[in-house]
Amino acid sequence: MPKTRRRPRRSQRKRPPTPWPTSQGLDRVFFSDTQSTCLETVYKATGAPSLGDYVRPAYIVTPYWPPVQSIRSPGTPSMDALSAQLYSSLSLDSPPSPPREPLRPSRSLPRQSLIQPPTFHPPSSRPCANTPPSEMDTWNPPLGSTSQPCLFQTPDSGPKTCTPSGEAPLSACTSTSFPPPSPGPSCPT
């Protein structure tokens, strides 16, 4: 039989002692000890007092302020009178009405734009001599109007349009073309 070499057993007593308890029953003590040690170290490093030096104050005294002298102007009711008046005005039988909200437009109605487009009025039936040419140049017919071009009948010729060079009667001297012609229509004086 070959000889087996025997290994010498190390005894657990020769191991260097650990700084914390090793038994499982003392786990609670281990955690609390380490926590308090760490906290104490951190507090000391930042300059705060350690947990061991902390003494809880027995009683904190709140300062007593004397009542304020009444500074109100003569003729002004006191707060007690105001609160009594408010209490008497509110009836306890009916609950206070909620604040009324402005009526919201329904979703079915089309939303009105905040900026209204300008409305153009057709020129009045004044003679053209009194109307300055700037008004006639800037007037545009409404979009939905079905007005026809400015046609008029003269006894000697057929239908004729109002042109700057042509002569036209006083009643038919407004330009309805869109956009307006560059030189304004001239009217006979």
Swiss-Prot record:
A motif (Nuclear localization signal, and RNA-binding (RxRE)) lies at residues 2-18. Induction: Down-regulated by P30II. GO terms for biological process: mRNA transport. The modification Phosphoserine is found at residues 70, 177. Belongs to the deltaretrovirus Rex protein family. Rex escorts unspliced gag-pro-pol and singly spliced env mRNAs out of the nucleus of infected cells. These mRNAs carry a recognition sequence called Rex responsive element (RxRE or XRE) located at the 3' region of the long terminal repeat (LTR). This function is essential since most HTLV proteins are translated from unspliced or partially spliced pre-mRNAs that cannot exit the nucleus by the pathway used by fully processed cellular mRNAs. Rex itself is translated from a fully spliced mRNA that probably readily exits the nucleus. This is Protein Rex. It comes from Human T-cell leukemia virus 1 (strain Japan ATK-1 subtype A).
